[in-house]
Design a protein with these regions (language model features):
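Class I S-adenosyl-L-methionine-dependent methyltransferase catalytic core
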Residues: 1-187
Length: 187
């Protein structure tokens, strides 16, 4: 795996921890091409962060700050290593916690986000994801427009989304389906 574009372009990321399925370079490249205008200066939340490849791509492309969340200590260590490799650690926070527990904390201590990236294991149930999506809620999202990106297996069920969200775009890369959600008024 490597960083596709931006300040860390071409830098190789470290080994993938056991049980982590990172988004392919091709899918990341396509996704971030679609998000080209949203990433610069964005505050980003990377849930189910794994190796951190999605959030690191956002940082490399000019995101102001990324909060990485993964429940695995091995994944958190890999994220720290990859942030050091790419020299992007100064604009990142790594939290070792379950995604649902992280979004359930009240009040949000990490501010509001312009972009939320979710790349859960394909076997995470749609109902579990619905809890996480509800937990993201309006108090965690920017008032000036936001995008939530969910990666699922093409054979995985997709969650029911909050009523004020709309599917803005769907992208398919091999066995991955990438869904971009936006607030109804912004879609």
């Amino acid at each position: 795996m490597r960083v596709i574009a931006g300040s860390a372009k071409g830098m190789r990321l470290g080994p993938v921890p056991p049980g982590v399925r990172p988004v392919s370079d091709r899918a990341r490249e396509g996704l971030f091409s679609s998000l080209a205008l949203e990433v610069p200066d964005a505050r980003v939340l990377d849930l189910y962060a794994g190796t951190g490849s999605m959030g690191i791509e956002a940082l490399s492309r000019g995101a102001a700050h990324v909060v990485f969340v993964d429940r695995s200590y091995e994944a958190s260590a890999a994220i720290h290593d990859n942030l050091d490799r790419t020299r992007l650690a100064d604009r990142a926070t790594v939290v070792t916690e379950d995604a649902a527990a992280f979004v359930a904390q009240a009040p949000p201590t990490t501010g509001r986000f312009d972009l939320v990236l979710l790349d859960p294991p394909y076997d995470v149930s749609a109902s579990s994801l619905e809890d996480v999506l509800r937990g993201i809620g309006p108090e965690r999202l920017s008032d000036l427009g936001w995008t939530v990106v969910l990666t699922r297996g093409v054979k995985s069920s997709t969650p029911v989304i909050p009523i004020d969200w709309a599917v803005a775009r769907q992208l398919r890369y091999g066995d991955s389906l990438v869904i971009l959600y936006r607030e109804v008024s912004w879609a």
